[in-house]
Amino acid sequence: KTNWASYLTSPKLEKHLPKFLFESEMQVILAEPLSDSFSDLRDYLIFEILYCTGLRVSELASLKVSLIRESDGKLVVRGKGNKERVVFLGESAKKCLQRYLVLRNSRNKLDKSEDALFLSQRDQQLSIRGIQYLVSSYLDKLGIYKHISPHVLRHSFATHLLNSGADIR
């Protein structure tokens, strides 16, 4: 018997470059928080941390206040495979984090044992889907009507590092 399928070649799939934002677009997004309200400051901080650290949205959602060292902007992150690693915040993100923590900790309804960094309006830990929604709605408030997911910010982080000559391996 002849296996006629062995004469066929499979089609080559196109490799797509990941979506990313240009540095000028990130400057618009990170210009400043829309207001000093709890939700606007939280949403802005989400962008700051995603972009300056390259975290996955799942890592961001699981950040704990107890694993933050405010003094030097050090965050302990639990990533894929339950592995811990340390990331550092830039100056802008550190300042925003300090402002956010003051607002977060002064909320009346807040259960003081709640350790999640990012909280909803009901003072519960934000879910991954909740963060994805907040990213989209914050961009709408800024008048940026592109579909940008938290993962696009991760790609932007890596792309901008590469463009600056960093080795990201």
Which residue ranges define each predicted feature?
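Conserved catalytic core of the tyrosine transesterase superfamily
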Residues: K1-R169
